[in-house]
Amino acid sequence: MRVPKKERQTELQHTIEQNPFITDEALATHFNVSIQTIRLDRMEMKIPELRERIKHVATERLDDVRTLTENEVIGDMIDLKLDTSAISILEILPEHAFSRNAIARGHILFAQANSLAIALIDDELALTTKANVQFTRSVHVGERVVAKAFVSSHRQDGRSDINVESFVGDECVFIGEFTVYRSSKEESK
């Protein structure tokens, strides 16, 4: 059963405030309307498209990345607390995948996780010294990969252990344990 436009728009506003990363497709399914209707509602209410919402959230939640430039981070960084945790989102595009089966190349998922682990370090120089990774399912073109990283320990030798898990929806698709060297041992906690 369709909801009246005013009521739908009020609910749409609330839904996007609760989850700014929700897609127009998911909203259309939720409200049982077309994607075009959702886009028209968003335009009428001056709610930006998903990519702009992600950038807006990112500017509010990011510490300054010290180890990498913005274009060296694979995916869109949406949350960063240096030496603590970070989150990035990567939309899998055709150029990220094998052409014959539209499955994302493993090095793309690894690069997203590795760059997130490096960006997490509060130092001018950070390098991956060890990585133990597991791919738990194939990721396909059009899927959105959310990588979540957190520092599990800071060692006396100036290295940090970082765990990264990547998800498509609620399903884990990648698990990585990274050891990252930092150049300033005295800054490690």
UniProtKB/Swiss-Prot annotation:
<keyword id="KW-0804">Transcription</keyword>
<comment type="similarity">
    <text>Belongs to the FapR family.</text>
</comment>
<dbReference type="GO" id="GO:0003677">
    <property type="term" value="F:DNA binding"/>
</dbReference>
<dbReference type="GO" id="GO:0045892">
    <property type="term" value="P:negative regulation of DNA-templated transcription"/>
</dbReference>
<dbReference type="GO" id="GO:0003700">
    <property type="term" value="F:DNA-binding transcription factor activity"/>
</dbReference>
<keyword id="KW-0443">Lipid metabolism</keyword>
<keyword id="KW-0444">Lipid biosynthesis</keyword>
<keyword id="KW-0678">Repressor</keyword>
<protein>
    <recommendedName>
        <fullName>Transcription factor FapR</fullName>
    </recommendedName>
</protein>
<keyword id="KW-0276">Fatty acid metabolism</keyword>
<keyword id="KW-0275">Fatty acid biosynthesis</keyword>
<dbReference type="InterPro" id="IPR036388">
    <property type="entry name" value="WH-like_DNA-bd_sf"/>
</dbReference>
<keyword id="KW-0238">DNA-binding</keyword>
<dbReference type="InterPro" id="IPR029069">
    <property type="entry name" value="HotDog_dom_sf"/>
</dbReference>
<dbReference type="GO" id="GO:0006633">
    <property type="term" value="P:fatty acid biosynthetic process"/>
</dbReference>
<keyword id="KW-0805">Transcription regulation</keyword>
<dbReference type="GO" id="GO:0045717">
    <property type="term" value="P:negative regulation of fatty acid biosynthetic process"/>
</dbReference>
<dbReference type="InterPro" id="IPR017275">
    <property type="entry name" value="Transcription_factor_FapR"/>
</dbReference>
<comment type="function">
    <text>Transcriptional factor involved in regulation of membrane lipid biosynthesis by repressing genes involved in fatty acid and phospholipid metabolism.</text>
</comment>
